[in-house]
């Protein structure tokens, strides 16, 4: 085993990386409220795991979406638990993100030189809200359908380009299969990818600049 470790150590300098991680200074003023961002990340990872599990059974078509969700809840092994955890962690992620934003704002964590960290955090907040909007529609029940119809209809109030934006979001003039396909793609691929990228940027900047000082 030591030879295997030495082989990787010679090429990747694992010990140097470990020393850098474990030797990072944590300011004495840090308390439990500084963990809210990490809890949000944990909720996101739970979302990825449970969401991936549900893709084995979910069918993103207007005729089969609702039935596939029912199958997950009643027939698939532990499907009810996986979907429930997905829903609960989604609510928890939104709550923790809001509390994290308040903590950062109240402690002045957005000030120089951490402006870009704040900007990436705001982008992550928008992405989190987008997860909620797109995920809400996927069961394609009455609530999901009308929620999509209302949300995608909002841009119509924009002068000149409003109708084009609505058609872009829906995939056609009305809500239907194209809309569900778009929202499913956004929810399962585009948004997770963007979230992972901005989280990496967010945590890299925190790692570089350190935790902000007390108020």
UniProtKB/Swiss-Prot annotation:
Intracellular or extracellular location(s): Plastid, Chloroplast thylakoid membrane
Similarity comment: Belongs to the cytochrome b family. PetB subfamily.
Subunit structure: The 4 large subunits of the cytochrome b6-f complex are cytochrome b6, subunit IV (17 kDa polypeptide, PetD), cytochrome f and the Rieske protein, while the 4 small subunits are PetG, PetL, PetM and PetN. The complex functions as a dimer.
Name used for this protein in its record: Cytochrome b6
Cofactor: heme b; heme c
Binding, heme b 1: 100, 202
Topology of this chain in the membrane: Multi-pass membrane protein
Record's function text: Component of the cytochrome b6-f complex, which mediates electron transfer between photosystem II (PSII) and photosystem I (PSI), cyclic electron flow around PSI, and state transitions.
InterPro entries: Cyt_b/b6_N, Cyt_B6_PetB, Cytb/b6-like_sf, Cytochrome_b_N_euk/bac, Di-haem_cyt_TM
Bound cofactor: record note: Binds 2 heme b groups non-covalently with two histidine residues as axial ligands. Binds one heme group covalently by a single cysteine link with no axial amino acid ligand. This heme was named heme ci.
Organism, scientific name: Lotus japonicus
GO CC annotation terms, alphabetical: chloroplast thylakoid membrane
Chain residues that bind heme b 2: 86, 187
């Amino acid at each position: 085993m030591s030879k295997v470790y030495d082989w990787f150590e010679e090429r990747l300098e694992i010990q140097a990386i470990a020393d850098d991680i474990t030797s990072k200074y944590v300011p004495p003023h840090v308390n439990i409220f500084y963990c809210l961002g990490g809890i949000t990340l944990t909720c996101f990872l739970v979302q990825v795991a449970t969401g991936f599990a549900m893709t084995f059974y979910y069918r993103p078509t207007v005729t089969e979406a609702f039935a596939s969700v029912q199958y997950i809840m009643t027939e698939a092994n532990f499907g009810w638990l996986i979907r429930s955890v997905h829903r609960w962690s989604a609510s928890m992620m939104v709550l923790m993100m809001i509390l994290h934003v308040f903590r950062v704002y109240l402690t002045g964590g957005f000030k120089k030189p951490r402006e870009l960290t704040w900007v990436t955090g705001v982008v992550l907040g928008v992405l989190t809200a987008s997860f909620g909007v797109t995920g809400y529609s996927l069961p394609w029940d009455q609530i999901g359908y009308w929620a999509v119809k209302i949300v995608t209809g909002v841009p119509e109030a924009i002068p000149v380009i409003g109708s084009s934006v609505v058609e872009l979001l829906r995939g056609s003039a009305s809500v239907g299969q194209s809309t569900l396909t778009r929202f499913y793609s956004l929810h399962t691929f585009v948004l997770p990818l963007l979230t992972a990228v901005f989280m990496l940027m967010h945590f890299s900047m925190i790692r570089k600049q350190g935790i902000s000082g007390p108020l």
